[in-house]
A protein has these predicted regions:
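PDZ-domain C-terminal substructure recognizer with occasional recognition of PDZ-binding tails
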Residues: 28, 155-162, 183, 190, ...
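PDZ/PDZ-like domain segments forming the peptide/carboxylate-binding groove
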Residues: 104-108, 112-113, 171-206, 210-213
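Active-site region of chymotrypsin-like
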Residues: 44-52, 77-140, 169, 177, ...
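Terminal peptide-recognition signature
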Residues: 4, 27, 41, 63-68, ...
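Sec/Tat-exported extracytoplasmic proteins
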Residues: 4-6, 12, 19, 70, ...
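Conserved active-site neighborhood of the chymotrypsin/trypsin-like protease fold
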Residues: 1-77, 99, 108, 180, ...
Length: 262
């Protein structure tokens, strides 16, 4: 069983797993969780490599020494330091309460293993971003999804291919913080928001009657509207006009190819 970051395998038509020892075996997408970003791949052949233990009991904090290891063996492993544990809001309707940020940034971060001092797996590499603690210039870091988010959903991923809970409402809306405002940065062609008249550049003021001052607050208010299928009402400013936009949300997973071997 291989744990990776989901965007590498979502809607994949074929998967091959290779090791630094050589050889390759086919793989199958076993599960993908939209909320954490974790993806599971089942090897359809024997992998001649040892498994790594999950470090779910380790407290990971700023200053911890870690290793970020990508494919390719030791030559693609980078000694790093945890520079922060903090909230991360992504423009694509994504939010982590306590993401792990490490530096220096690994050039091959996607799906890389974050390994703690005891040799256990403490996270999976997701992004290359810029980070500032407010006292220094912004620097390149990797954002890592913490491993402790996996155990609560692992059985569901193995059984159903996704967490067995009501899915969050998905709008198909890309948003960003610009000068203390939440701005529509783009719209997914297949998403429900693209059919409502929203345009890039529109400023989002509130979800229903609840003002939103940050991207994280915006996503939380959207998800508080109910499960997928719920209507999400936005107050939006365009030029000098304010208007309400009603978006019939959907389940994002329905828009994607799903695992078929369950």
């Amino acid at each position: 069983l291989v744990l990776t970051i989901g965007y590498l395998i979502s809607e994949a038509e074929s998967i091959w797993l290779t090791s630094s020892l050589g050889g390759a075996v086919p793989g199958h997408v076993l599960g993908y969780d939209q909320e954490t970003g974790f993806g599971l791949v089942q090897a359809l052949g024997r992998l001649s490599v040892p498994a790594i233990e999950m470090g779910t009991r380790i407290r990971v904090g700023a200053g911890d020494k870690v290793i970020l290891a990508a494919e390719g063996g030791r030559r693609h492993a980078v000694a790093a330091t945890v520079v922060a544990r903090q909230e991360f809001a992504g423009y694509w309707e994504y939010l982590l309460d306590r993401a792990i940020f490490t530096a220096p940034a690994h050039p091959f971060w996607g799906g890389a293993a974050l390994i703690g001092g005891d040799g256990s797996l403490i996270g999976i590499g997701s992004l290359h971003v810029q980070h500032s603690n407010g006292r220094e210039l912004r620097r390149d870091v990797n954002m890592v999804v913490p491993i402790d988010l996996l155990p609560p959903i692992l059985d569901d991923l193995l059984t159903y291919g996704r967490p067995n809970r009501p899915p969050r409402p998905w709008l198909g809306l890309y948003a960003a913080e610009v000068e203390d405002a939440i701005v529509v940065a783009g719209l997914s062609d297949r998403g429900p928001a693209s059919k409502t008249g929203l345009k890039p550049g529109d400023r989002i003021l509130a979800v229903r009657d609840e003002p939103v001052a940050s991207l994280a607050a915006f996503w939380r208010r959207v998800w508080a509207s109910g499960p997928a299928g719920s209507e999400v009402v936005l107050q939006v400013a365009r030029d000098k006009e304010t208007m309400k936009v009603r978006i019939p949300s959907t389940d994002r997973t329905r828009m994607m190819k799903a695992p078929r071997l369950h």
